Amino acid sequence: MSHYAIILAAGKGTRMKSDLPKVLHKVSGITMLEHVFRAVSVIEPAKNVTVIGHKAELVREVLDGQSAFTMQTEQLGTGHAVMMAEEELAGLEGQTLVIAGDTPLITGESLKNLIDFHVNHKNVATILTATADNPFGYGRIIRNENGEVTKIVEQKDANEFEQQVKEINTGTYVFDNKRLFEALKNINTNNAQGEYYLTDVISIFRENGEKVGAYILRDFEESLGVNDRVALATAEDVMRRRINKTHMINGVTFQNPNATYIDVDVEIAPDVVIEANVTLKGQTKVGAESVLTNGTYIVDSTIGANTVITNSMIEHSVVEKGATVGPFAHIRPDSMLKEGVHIGNFVEVKGSTIGENTKAGHLTYIGNAEVGSDVNFGAGTITVNYDGQHKFKTQIANNAFIGSNSTLIAPLEIGDNALTAAGSTITDNVPADSVAIGRSRQVNKEGYAIKKPHHPSQQK
């Protein structure tokens, strides 16, 4: 039998106090909506419908091409939101999962278990529930003396007895698709919120003698709905612990997993060592037996095996195996450091390719450059690549030696085995096997310093 899914993503999220729609706030690198969509994908729905409303086009962009969409122009409650999906799902045979787009911690495994429970028990509706130590703010699951679910009562509508119930509604359900839309035609807004409650269909099913069940989550944390920044931080904390635990199980060493921040799509090979206060974001990949020391920050980059990154930032770049970077280096976007490269302290590389075994030990800027293998950069070298309007390229061939405090003014080519003298400003191409000296000759004026105020002879 086919499965379908409705993701509710139309709300503004007023308590977030943000111009961004609530479901587009990120947890561990991707939006809450994407987390939910990935979990839903585990049940392999024949059709997925996302209900959008507030800033609909922004929300649509996130799942464009992956989901059907329907508009809820007025936010009149969860029941009303599901009504908007009828055009996409009306008349279809099967089970429909309904889930909120602000529940990023739900897992695909739990949703699959929920679907299986629903089908195996032949329910017309199944509620995903959880047991809360503090149930305030949640809808309560009310059962009869036989343990059967009779209704769901929202916090504002609950009496004193019902408020003591700790089994709560997570806001996720599975329904017989046809019966869901039939029942929705019979709900109304006679409640404290003046909204169409999706939960009212449960009472309708019970009144008709139809079977309603509840599947209890094993992990209460999965039920978290994010309505404000406090809950967003909680979700981030839980997700971080999950991610880091998975990497540790897979053979990665963490000095302090509570102080290491890794996005959900990051890939890390076994035997990598990660010290505290490391951040790995986006689509970053780290090869086996690499070491990332305290303070390293890497975004959307590929780090090869056996590399050592020491307290440095790497963005949108590739670092091949055996390279060392840092401390305090900055590898800016579109750079490639090839095998065995050494980039030392206070070196910045931008939009450049650095060849095998090349070394830039300290205090160097390499921008828009093509650098060969076995090149050595002396301290204080700068590629001058920008004239205020255009960027120009510096090309340095294999085994060149760039003397300390060289200024390389692009466009410029330096040939194989060439050398630039320390302190030179190089403006013309340097042929292979040549030495380039671009500095004025030193002149010593003997006795001249005696006339200066600092000289002892001038002191009274």
From Swiss-Prot:
It is an enzyme of class 2 (transferase). It is found in: Cytoplasm. Pathway: Nucleotide-sugar biosynthesis; UDP-N-acetyl-alpha-D-glucosamine biosynthesis; N-acetyl-alpha-D-glucosamine 1-phosphate from alpha-D-glucosamine 6-phosphate (route II): step 2/2; Nucleotide-sugar biosynthesis; UDP-N-acetyl-alpha-D-glucosamine biosynthesis; UDP-N-acetyl-alpha-D-glucosamine from N-acetyl-alpha-D-glucosamine 1-phosphate: step 1/1; Bacterial outer membrane biogenesis; LPS lipid A biosynthesis. Keywords: Acyltransferase, Cell shape, Cell wall biogenesis/degradation, Cytoplasm, Magnesium, Metal-binding, Multifunctional enzyme, Nucleotidyltransferase, Peptidoglycan synthesis, Repeat, Transferase. Residues 230-250 are annotated as: Linker. InterPro entries: Bifunctional_GlmU, GlmU-like, GlmU/GlgC-like_hexapep, GlmU_C_LbH, Hexapep, NTP_transferase_dom, Nucleotide-diphossugar_trans, Trimer_LpxA-like_sf. UDP-N-acetyl-alpha-D-glucosamine binds at residues 8-11, 22, 72, 77-78, 139, 154, 169, 227, 332, 350, 365, 376. The keyword Electron transport does not apply. Binds 1 Mg(2+) ion per subunit. The active site is at 362 (proton acceptor). It holds the Pfam family NTP_transferase. Acetyl-CoA binds at residues 379, 385-386, 404, 422, 439. Residues 251-460 are annotated as: N-acetyltransferase. Its EC number is 2.7.7.23, 2.3.1.157. Its cofactor is Mg(2+). Mg(2+) binds at residues 102, 227. Residues 1-229 are annotated as: Pyrophosphorylase. GO terms for cellular component: cytoplasm; membrane. It catalyses: alpha-D-glucosamine 1-phosphate + acetyl-CoA = N-acetyl-alpha-D-glucosamine 1-phosphate + CoA + H(+); N-acetyl-alpha-D-glucosamine 1-phosphate + UTP + H(+) = UDP-N-acetyl-alpha-D-glucosamine + diphosphate. GO terms for molecular function: glucosamine-1-phosphate N-acetyltransferase activity; magnesium ion binding; UDP-N-acetylglucosamine diphosphorylase activity. Homotrimer. Catalyzes the last two sequential reactions in the de novo biosynthetic pathway for UDP-N-acetylglucosamine (UDP-GlcNAc). The C-terminal domain catalyzes the transfer of acetyl group from acetyl coenzyme A to glucosamine-1-phosphate (GlcN-1-P) to produce N-acetylglucosamine-1-phosphate (GlcNAc-1-P), which is converted into UDP-GlcNAc by the transfer of uridine 5-monophosphate (from uridine 5-triphosphate), a reaction catalyzed by the N-terminal domain. In the N-terminal section; belongs to the N-acetylglucosamine-1-phosphate uridyltransferase family. This is Bifunctional protein GlmU.
